[in-house]
Amino acid sequence: MQESLNSNDFKEYAAKKAKHITSAKNIAPLLECIASLPTIPSHFYSDNGIHIVAQDKTLAQKYHKAIYTLATQLKPWRKGPFFLFDIHIDSEWQSFMKWQLLAPHCNLEGKYIADVGCNNGYYMFEMLLQGKKLYKKIIGFDPSGIFKCQFDFINHFINAPIEFELLGVEDLLAYSQAHNQSFDVIFCLGVLYHRFDPINTLKILSQSLNKGGELILDTLIYESNEEICLCPAQSYAKMSNVYFIPSIPTLKGWCERANLYDFEVINLTPTTTQEQRQSAWVDSQSLSAFLNETQTRTIEGYQAPLRGYFKLKKR
């Protein structure tokens, strides 16, 4: 998205994009079903997942079948888990494991926050609790219709003051300019290796931050001390949309080109089948099918997934 659009033109563009996504024949009926769900006052908390507790358990039980049926229609559930009343939405990723790594390094109070590639909003619900409601605003960006449906479904019961924009990272700077507001903290988790243009992506993230603003970055890392980058020929761990997996020195150089400094390595951790695994809520293969028999290499013969978690600042 070109950031040269004026505010009104960008907002019109964003509205048209959202309408196109939400009017798709596989998405519109789901959104209608979500909107027709009963109001069930609830509260939520985090404990190895997001737990949603109904204040009126009789009312929740009355609509159990309808809620459960709709939840299954919203598959695949990649991020979670969610414990919605007595329904355990056992997502492919145990996302709380990532959040527990990141949370001690995130000061969200009083911050204007973006979650780029927010999926179904799992991490935004965690941020909401982490920020103790003293944040300025939390906005998620993801152009996926099914993830928007999942977010709306969960938030129907949580009723959290979170915004979800059906926009991609390429739209972030234009969004920021159209709303005359840069971000204090941007989360970009599991997005960079899916981009054709990782340096430009980092520049967009940097340009969308306030001076001194923080980027919390999660990306696949190639284990090497050299300034090199893995560019998979066809696929990586059966993902055909993985294009660049940098070493840490390479990633640091990319970030400096994007005016992102104070490069802090929060954690380096291999992805395990404890964190990512097959589930009845996904209906597809997962990590164990993407690795060799000893789980030391991908099925293509590359290094097994190693995730790096980083914190950077814009100068």
Swiss-Prot record:
SUPFAM superfamilies: S-adenosyl-L-methionine-dependent methyltransferases. InterPro entries: CmoB, Mo5U34_MeTrfas-like, SAM-dependent_MTases_sf. It holds the Pfam family Methyltransf_9. GO terms for molecular function: transferase activity, transferring alkyl or aryl (other than methyl) groups. Carboxy-S-adenosyl-L-methionine binds at K79, W93, K98, G117, D142, P143, S144, V169, E170, Y193, R307. It comes from the Bacteria. GO terms for biological process: tRNA wobble uridine modification. HAMAP family: tRNA_carboxymethyltr_CmoB (MF_01590). Belongs to the class I-like SAM-binding methyltransferase superfamily. CmoB family. Homotetramer. This is tRNA U34 carboxymethyltransferase. It comes from Helicobacter hepaticus (strain ATCC 51449 / 3B1).
